[in-house]
Amino acid sequence: MQYPEPISKLIDSYMRLPGIGAKTATRLAFYTIDMNKDDVTAFAKSLVAAKEDLHYCSICGNITDEDPCAICRDKSRDQSTILVVEQPKDVMSIDRAQDYHGLYHVLHGVLSPIEGRGPEDLNIESLLKRLKANKAVKEVIIATNATPEGEATAQYLARLIKPAGIKVTRLAHGLSVGSDIEYADEMTLMKAVEGRTEL
């Protein structure tokens, strides 16, 4: 049996989300149909507002509704360290652990020749300009995921940054190979920041 077109379109829309297959998308579509109209309208408005009101910080690349973001504006944070992550969600995960009090920089991905993603596709140039302009930075902590692409990106960044005399370290203990920062618990992230190693 074929679903009516509005349901098919809704299922297709849900399937565009990462990790959502046909079965889950169908379940979400029927759940949405069963919701009352006010809740569906509020949900739709939240989606539109997130897309319209959020953008990337012009300094660090984190997601924000103000520019610069709250972290970059916070002068009480340690201005001597910048922790480099793959995605904005990684900033949220690490900051939630409340053990790191420095600045962040979001790459928006990692080097991946297989996917055709090179240095020019990442937020690397702005990091280098930021380091050149901000002489207070003494350490860059690279917190890319423990994947081959994350490791390659960390090594690439270290080669670019070290000649400037800035210490470059990498998150350590507790993050197993192939793991994503997003899914690590707060204690593991705290230990990873504390136990970082120099590259």
UniProtKB/Swiss-Prot annotation:
CDD domains: TOPRIM_recR. InterPro entries: DNA_Rcmb_RecR (IPR000093), Rcmb_RecR (IPR023627), Rcmb_RecR_Znf (IPR015967), TOPRIM_dom (IPR006171), TOPRIM_RecR (IPR034137). Residues 80-176 form the Toprim domain. GO terms for biological process: DNA recombination; DNA repair. GO terms for molecular function: DNA binding; zinc ion binding. Pfam families: RecR_C (PF21175), RecR_HhH (PF21176), RecR_ZnF (PF02132), Toprim_4 (PF13662). A zinc finger (C4-type) spans 57-72. SMART domains: TOPRIM. Keywords: DNA damage, DNA recombination, DNA repair, Metal-binding, Zinc, Zinc-finger. The keyword Cytoplasm does not apply. NCBIfam families: recR. Belongs to the RecR family. May play a role in DNA repair. It seems to be involved in an RecBC-independent recombinational process of DNA repair. It may act with RecF and RecO. This is Recombination protein RecR.
